[in-house]
């Protein structure tokens, strides 16, 4: 999970890169933070997709009356 502080830092680096540019160290930090954020989003999306149940599957498993 990406913390609020890390998201804030990502946004600070984006703003700074647009206004004045980043040092090599800041570019590496930005790249690492972005990758961590992307990985967290992918993990969350995968968990949501894995929890989806199809209605047809549920209806087939019901006992017939």
Swiss-Prot record:
Tell me which UniProt keywords the record has, alphabetically: Cytoplasm
- Entry's SUPFAM superfamilies? YnzC-like
Where it sits in the cell: the answer is:
Cytoplasm
Gene3D superfamilies, per the entry: Helix hairpin bin
Specify where it is mainly localized.
cytoplasm
Family under the similarity heading: Belongs to the UPF0291 family.
Q: What is this protein called?
A: UPF0291 protein BBR47_33060
What's the source species for this entry?
Brevibacillus brevis (strain 47 / JCM 6285 / NBRC 100599)
Q: What is the lineage of its organism?
A: Bacteria, Bacillati, Bacillota, Bacilli, Bacillales
């Amino acid at each position: 999970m990406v913390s609020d502080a890390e998201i804030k830092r990502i946004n600070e680096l984006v703003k700074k890169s647009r206004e004045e540019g980043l040092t090599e160290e800041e570019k590496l930090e930005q790249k690492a933070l972005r990758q961590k954020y992307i990985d967290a989003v992918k993990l969350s999306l995968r968990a949501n997709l894995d929890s989806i149940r199809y209605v047809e599957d549920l209806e087939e498993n019901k006992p017939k009356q």
